[in-house]
């Protein structure tokens, strides 16, 4: 199959310089064992912007006769970090911190990861950026993902998932969600983020409560929406909420004359 995903992430709606993210990814299998992918990413917050693109390669190994497989992946990416201070208004003119109006830096980086999976379970770990960079504070992040899908009835399945993120000098945080999947077409459920030090979401760790919902519009097209509301005090009248929209195209191949079922992960 070939899959194309388009994502838009918006935070602090109606605030100038609010965080925004756009992402595009394309992946396909060249054979039963080899897959390749391409992704592009644009992230902006205030005067800072990060634009990157990457090429991914994956090799899949079949571990047993029960469809347990291991995917090993490598990533090569180019990242342009930009800082434009020309629109910043300061209290005092001539502030030395703002003498350099623009700053740009291009970095080449590499990533690696693995993905262990079967039709009902997955476990993965990845490091998107192996090389750290000081000027724009690019740190090495470790990601761990774990999830599965459980059949409750012919029309209902539950899909719990966990994402753990570890960065040096920052609290280890995790995102947790559980979806209800109805008729292999609709899904919805709660999600939240917290840190290992704070079991419940807290503003300090960027915690939030949220919800996610989606639908397969057709066998090849799905649409998802996620809402996140941060915890803690709201300051300066800013509504610290996040909206995320995902559009996914799946061009499914035929195997022995039978169309494969929609992918849930």
Which stretches of residues belong to each language-model region?
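Subset of outer-membrane beta-barrel
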Residues: 1-265
